[in-house]
């Protein structure tokens, strides 16, 4: 499987059986910049703390960097 990996947001090969993930959360600059985003791959979908959004998927490049809605 190929997943996008931060910080470069490049597509990289991950080991067989891994899943891609997109993790998003707010930091002190959330109001100005939007949520922080972490892209990667893991053996299983990571467990996250409250307030952190995680999406996992298992097809090539299924975790692109989310686009921010313009108002």
Curated annotation (Swiss-Prot):
<dbReference type="GO" id="GO:0090729">
    <property type="term" value="F:toxin activity"/>
</dbReference>
<feature type="disulfide bond">
    <location>
        <begin position="14"/>
        <end position="41"/>
    </location>
</feature>
<keyword id="KW-1015">Disulfide bond</keyword>
<dbReference type="InterPro" id="IPR003571">
    <property type="entry name" value="Snake_3FTx"/>
</dbReference>
<comment type="function">
    <text>Binds with high affinity to muscular (alpha-1/CHRNA1) and neuronal (alpha-7/CHRNA7) nicotinic acetylcholine receptor (nAChR) and inhibits acetylcholine from binding to the receptor, thereby impairing neuromuscular and neuronal transmission.</text>
</comment>
<dbReference type="GO" id="GO:0005576">
    <property type="term" value="C:extracellular region"/>
</dbReference>
<dbReference type="InterPro" id="IPR045860">
    <property type="entry name" value="Snake_toxin-like_sf"/>
</dbReference>
<protein>
    <recommendedName>
        <fullName>Long neurotoxin 1</fullName>
    </recommendedName>
</protein>
<keyword id="KW-0528">Neurotoxin</keyword>
<dbReference type="InterPro" id="IPR054131">
    <property type="entry name" value="Toxin_cobra-type"/>
</dbReference>
<keyword id="KW-0964">Secreted</keyword>
<dbReference type="InterPro" id="IPR018354">
    <property type="entry name" value="Snake_toxin_con_site"/>
</dbReference>
<keyword id="KW-0629">Postsynaptic neurotoxin</keyword>
<feature type="disulfide bond">
    <location>
        <begin position="57"/>
        <end position="62"/>
    </location>
</feature>
<dbReference type="GO" id="GO:0099106">
    <property type="term" value="F:ion channel regulator activity"/>
</dbReference>
<keyword id="KW-0008">Acetylcholine receptor inhibiting toxin</keyword>
<comment type="similarity">
    <text>Belongs to the three-finger toxin family. Long-chain subfamily. Type II alpha-neurotoxin sub-subfamily.</text>
</comment>
<feature type="disulfide bond">
    <location>
        <begin position="26"/>
        <end position="30"/>
    </location>
</feature>
<feature type="disulfide bond">
    <location>
        <begin position="45"/>
        <end position="56"/>
    </location>
</feature>
<dbReference type="GO" id="GO:0030550">
    <property type="term" value="F:acetylcholine receptor inhibitor activity"/>
</dbReference>
<keyword id="KW-0800">Toxin</keyword>
<dbReference type="Pfam" id="PF21947">
    <property type="entry name" value="Toxin_cobra-type"/>
</dbReference>
<keyword id="KW-0872">Ion channel impairing toxin</keyword>
<feature type="disulfide bond">
    <location>
        <begin position="3"/>
        <end position="20"/>
    </location>
</feature>
């Amino acid at each position: 499987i190929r997943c996008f990996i931060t910080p470069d947001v490049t597509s990289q090969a991950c080991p067989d059986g891994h899943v891609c993930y997109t993790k998003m959360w707010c930091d002190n600059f959330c109001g100005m910049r939007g949520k922080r985003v972490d892209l990667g791959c893991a053996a299983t979908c990571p467990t996250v703390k409250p307030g952190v959004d995680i999406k996992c998927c298992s097809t090539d490049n299924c975790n692109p960097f989310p686009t921010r809605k313009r108002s």
